[in-house]
Protein backbone atom coordinates (compact mmCIF):
# COMPACT_ATOMS: atom_id res chain seq x y z
CA UNK A 1 0.00 0.00 0.00
CA UNK A 2 1.21 3.45 -0.84
CA UNK A 3 0.17 6.11 1.60
CA UNK A 4 0.91 9.56 2.89
CA UNK A 5 1.08 12.41 0.44
CA UNK A 6 4.42 14.16 0.69
CA UNK A 7 3.66 17.06 -1.57
CA UNK A 8 0.86 18.25 -3.76
CA UNK A 9 2.18 19.70 -6.99
CA UNK A 10 0.96 22.67 -8.96
CA UNK A 11 -2.75 22.67 -9.62
CA UNK A 12 -3.61 23.34 -13.24
CA UNK A 13 -7.31 23.60 -12.54
CA UNK A 14 -10.35 24.44 -14.60
CA UNK A 15 -8.74 23.63 -17.91
CA UNK A 16 -10.97 23.63 -20.96
CA UNK A 17 -10.47 20.39 -22.85
CA UNK A 18 -8.80 21.13 -26.17
CA UNK A 19 -8.40 24.81 -25.29
CA UNK A 20 -5.30 26.93 -25.70
CA UNK A 21 -2.80 27.31 -22.89
CA UNK A 22 -3.05 31.08 -23.22
CA UNK A 23 -6.75 30.80 -22.51
CA UNK A 24 -6.41 29.20 -19.10
CA UNK A 25 -6.78 32.49 -17.31
CA UNK A 26 -10.23 32.96 -18.81
CA UNK A 27 -11.53 29.89 -17.00
CA UNK A 28 -10.17 30.73 -13.58
CA UNK A 29 -6.78 29.28 -12.71
CA UNK A 30 -5.89 28.22 -9.19
CA UNK A 31 -2.29 29.26 -8.62
CA UNK A 32 0.06 27.51 -6.21
CA UNK A 33 3.78 27.27 -5.65
CA UNK A 34 5.20 25.40 -2.71
CA UNK A 35 8.67 24.07 -3.43
CA UNK A 36 10.59 22.81 -0.39
CA UNK A 37 7.44 23.07 1.71
CA UNK A 38 8.56 20.61 4.40
CA UNK A 39 11.91 19.61 5.91
CA UNK A 40 11.27 16.11 4.59
CA UNK A 41 11.26 17.07 0.93
CA UNK A 42 14.09 19.54 1.51
CA UNK A 43 16.28 16.67 2.71
CA UNK A 44 14.83 14.22 0.15
CA UNK A 45 14.31 16.39 -2.97
CA UNK A 46 13.35 13.39 -5.07
CA UNK A 47 9.91 13.60 -3.46
CA UNK A 48 9.45 17.27 -4.32
CA UNK A 49 7.05 18.03 -7.18
CA UNK A 50 8.55 20.86 -9.22
CA UNK A 51 5.77 21.70 -11.65
CA UNK A 52 2.74 20.28 -13.42
CA UNK A 53 1.98 21.30 -17.00
CA UNK A 54 -1.09 20.57 -19.13
CA UNK A 55 -1.37 21.68 -22.74
CA UNK A 56 -2.82 20.63 -26.11
CA UNK A 57 -0.64 18.23 -28.08
CA UNK A 58 0.56 19.00 -31.60
CA UNK A 59 -2.03 16.53 -32.87
CA UNK A 60 -5.62 17.83 -32.52
CA UNK A 61 -7.74 15.98 -29.98
CA UNK A 62 -4.80 15.02 -27.79
CA UNK A 63 -3.47 16.43 -24.50
CA UNK A 64 -0.03 16.41 -22.87
CA UNK A 65 0.44 16.06 -19.11
CA UNK A 66 3.85 16.70 -17.52
CA UNK A 67 4.91 16.02 -13.93
CA UNK A 68 8.36 17.41 -13.09
CA UNK A 69 10.05 16.13 -9.96
CA UNK A 70 13.36 15.18 -8.33
CA UNK A 71 14.61 18.61 -7.35
CA UNK A 72 14.70 21.56 -9.77
CA UNK A 73 18.51 21.63 -9.83
CA UNK A 74 19.62 18.31 -11.29
CA UNK A 75 22.88 18.89 -13.21
CA UNK A 76 22.56 18.08 -16.90
CA UNK A 77 25.50 15.67 -16.73
CA UNK A 78 24.04 13.47 -13.99
CA UNK A 79 22.79 10.40 -15.86
CA UNK A 80 22.66 8.28 -12.69
CA UNK A 81 19.94 10.39 -11.07
CA UNK A 82 16.93 8.12 -10.67
CA UNK A 83 13.26 7.99 -9.85
CA UNK A 84 12.14 6.40 -6.59
CA UNK A 85 11.41 2.70 -7.04
CA UNK A 86 8.03 1.03 -6.62
CA UNK A 87 8.74 -0.16 -3.07
CA UNK A 88 9.60 3.42 -2.09
CA UNK A 89 7.52 5.86 -4.05
CA UNK A 90 4.36 6.27 -6.10
CA UNK A 91 4.10 9.09 -8.64
CA UNK A 92 0.60 10.17 -9.65
CA UNK A 93 -1.17 12.60 -11.93
CA UNK A 94 -4.76 13.08 -10.81
CA UNK A 95 -7.69 14.37 -12.85
CA UNK A 96 -10.97 15.88 -11.66
CA UNK A 97 -13.47 15.98 -14.53
CA UNK A 98 -16.64 16.64 -12.50
CA UNK A 99 -15.70 19.93 -10.84
CA UNK A 100 -15.70 18.78 -7.20
CA UNK A 101 -11.92 18.98 -6.60
CA UNK A 102 -11.76 15.21 -6.02
CA UNK A 103 -9.84 12.96 -8.38
CA UNK A 104 -12.01 10.96 -10.77
CA UNK A 105 -9.08 9.47 -12.69
CA UNK A 106 -5.47 8.76 -11.80
CA UNK A 107 -2.29 7.95 -13.65
CA UNK A 108 -0.05 5.87 -11.40
CA UNK A 109 3.59 5.71 -12.41
CA UNK A 110 6.07 3.36 -10.74
CA UNK A 111 9.71 2.48 -11.34
CA UNK A 112 11.94 -0.54 -10.82
CA UNK A 113 15.65 -1.13 -11.17
CA UNK A 114 18.84 0.73 -10.36
CA UNK A 115 20.46 3.75 -11.98
CA UNK A 116 21.05 3.24 -15.68
CA UNK A 117 18.66 0.30 -15.84
CA UNK A 118 15.36 1.67 -14.59
CA UNK A 119 12.02 0.66 -16.05
CA UNK A 120 8.75 2.57 -15.81
CA UNK A 121 5.19 1.28 -15.61
CA UNK A 122 2.01 3.30 -16.10
CA UNK A 123 -1.48 2.37 -14.98
CA UNK A 124 -4.15 4.78 -16.15
CA UNK A 125 -6.09 6.78 -16.72
CA UNK A 126 -8.18 4.68 -14.35
CA UNK A 127 -10.64 5.25 -11.51
CA UNK A 128 -8.73 5.32 -8.19
CA UNK A 129 -9.32 2.83 -5.39
CA UNK A 130 -9.21 5.67 -2.87
CA UNK A 131 -9.24 9.46 -3.04
CA UNK A 132 -7.52 12.16 -1.02
CA UNK A 133 -4.27 11.75 0.94
CA UNK A 134 -4.41 7.94 1.22
CA UNK A 135 -3.35 6.21 -1.97
CA UNK A 136 -3.38 2.55 -2.96
CA UNK A 137 -2.03 0.91 -6.09
CA UNK A 138 -4.77 0.36 -8.65
CA UNK A 139 -3.26 -2.84 -10.04
CA UNK A 140 -4.79 -4.51 -13.06
CA UNK A 141 -3.47 -4.47 -16.59
CA UNK A 142 -0.55 -2.16 -17.29
CA UNK A 143 -1.24 0.65 -19.74
CA UNK A 144 2.39 0.77 -20.84
CA UNK A 145 5.74 -0.40 -19.49
CA UNK A 146 9.35 -0.21 -20.65
CA UNK A 147 12.76 1.39 -20.12
CA UNK A 148 13.14 5.00 -19.01
CA UNK A 149 14.45 7.62 -21.47
CA UNK A 150 12.34 6.01 -24.17
CA UNK A 151 9.04 7.06 -25.77
CA UNK A 152 6.62 4.22 -25.03
CA UNK A 153 3.15 3.70 -26.48
CA UNK A 154 -0.02 1.68 -25.96
CA UNK A 155 -2.66 0.37 -28.34
CA UNK A 156 -5.22 2.93 -27.13
CA UNK A 157 -3.06 5.92 -28.00
CA UNK A 158 -1.38 6.62 -24.64
CA UNK A 159 2.29 7.61 -24.90
CA UNK A 160 4.73 7.84 -22.00
CA UNK A 161 8.22 9.21 -21.47
CA UNK A 162 10.09 9.28 -18.15
CA UNK A 163 13.59 10.66 -17.73
CA UNK A 164 15.70 13.81 -17.36
CA UNK A 165 14.66 16.83 -19.39
CA UNK A 166 15.75 20.47 -19.46
CA UNK A 167 13.81 22.26 -16.73
CA UNK A 168 11.28 24.45 -18.60
CA UNK A 169 10.78 26.84 -15.68
CA UNK A 170 12.34 30.33 -15.82
CA UNK A 171 13.43 32.12 -12.63
CA UNK A 172 16.30 34.20 -11.31
CA UNK A 173 16.60 31.76 -8.42
CA UNK A 174 19.77 33.21 -6.94
CA UNK A 175 18.15 36.63 -6.61
CA UNK A 176 14.99 35.07 -5.21
CA UNK A 177 16.96 33.55 -2.34
CA UNK A 178 18.64 36.91 -1.73
CA UNK A 179 15.14 38.34 -1.25
CA UNK A 180 13.76 35.40 0.75
CA UNK A 181 16.82 33.67 2.24
CA UNK A 182 14.85 31.42 4.57
CA UNK A 183 13.76 29.45 1.49
CA UNK A 184 17.27 28.70 0.22
CA UNK A 185 18.32 25.03 0.04
CA UNK A 186 20.44 23.40 2.71
CA UNK A 187 22.90 21.93 0.22
CA UNK A 188 24.57 23.07 -3.00
CA UNK A 189 25.94 26.46 -4.09
CA UNK A 190 22.75 28.36 -3.29
CA UNK A 191 23.01 27.28 0.35
CA UNK A 192 26.07 29.55 0.64
CA UNK A 193 24.05 32.72 0.07
CA UNK A 194 23.59 35.08 3.06
CA UNK A 195 21.00 34.05 5.64
CA UNK A 196 19.60 37.58 5.89
CA UNK A 197 17.88 39.49 3.05
CA UNK A 198 20.29 41.35 0.77
CA UNK A 199 17.77 42.36 -1.92
CA UNK A 200 14.16 43.51 -2.10
CA UNK A 201 13.32 42.91 -5.75
CA UNK A 202 14.32 40.89 -8.78
CA UNK A 203 17.02 42.17 -11.10
CA UNK A 204 15.97 44.27 -14.07
CA UNK A 205 15.37 42.85 -17.52
CA UNK A 206 18.70 42.19 -19.17
CA UNK A 207 20.39 41.64 -15.81
CA UNK A 208 18.30 38.80 -14.44
CA UNK A 209 19.66 35.27 -14.83
CA UNK A 210 17.71 32.17 -15.81
CA UNK A 211 19.37 30.20 -13.04
CA UNK A 212 17.81 26.84 -13.91
CA UNK A 213 19.07 26.98 -17.49
CA UNK A 214 21.24 23.95 -18.05
CA UNK A 215 19.64 21.98 -15.24
CA UNK A 216 17.26 19.07 -15.63
CA UNK A 217 14.27 17.88 -13.76
CA UNK A 218 13.07 14.29 -13.79
CA UNK A 219 10.05 14.48 -16.07
CA UNK A 220 7.10 12.16 -16.48
CA UNK A 221 5.35 13.04 -19.75
CA UNK A 222 2.06 11.50 -20.88
CA UNK A 223 0.29 12.24 -24.17
CA UNK A 224 -3.13 10.76 -24.84
CA UNK A 225 -6.50 11.37 -26.50
CA UNK A 226 -8.35 14.11 -24.62
CA UNK A 227 -11.45 11.91 -24.72
CA UNK A 228 -9.80 9.65 -22.13
CA UNK A 229 -9.60 12.52 -19.64
CA UNK A 230 -13.12 13.92 -19.70
CA UNK A 231 -16.37 12.65 -18.20
CA UNK A 232 -18.32 13.02 -21.46
CA UNK A 233 -16.30 13.10 -24.70
CA UNK A 234 -19.31 14.64 -26.48
CA UNK A 235 -19.32 17.58 -24.03
CA UNK A 236 -15.74 17.74 -22.74
CA UNK A 237 -16.00 20.94 -20.65
CA UNK A 238 -13.32 21.46 -18.04
CA UNK A 239 -11.00 19.21 -16.08
CA UNK A 240 -8.50 19.85 -13.31
CA UNK A 241 -5.07 18.24 -13.03
CA UNK A 242 -2.55 17.96 -10.21
CA UNK A 243 0.45 15.82 -9.34
CA UNK A 244 1.51 14.03 -6.16
CA UNK A 245 4.19 11.77 -4.80
CA UNK A 246 3.51 9.26 -2.03
CA UNK A 247 5.81 7.20 0.13
CA UNK A 248 5.12 3.61 1.13
CA UNK A 249 4.01 3.12 4.71
CA UNK A 250 6.93 2.55 7.06
CA UNK A 251 9.57 4.24 4.88
Model-derived features: positions:
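Bacterial N-terminal signal peptides that target proteins for export
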Residues: 2-15
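Surface-exposed extracytoplasmic segments
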Residues: 28-251
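Bacterial N-terminal signal peptides
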Residues: 13-23
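Generic start-of-chain signal for non-secretory N-termini
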Residues: 3-5, 23-33
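Detector for methionine-enriched segments
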Residues: 1-2, 218
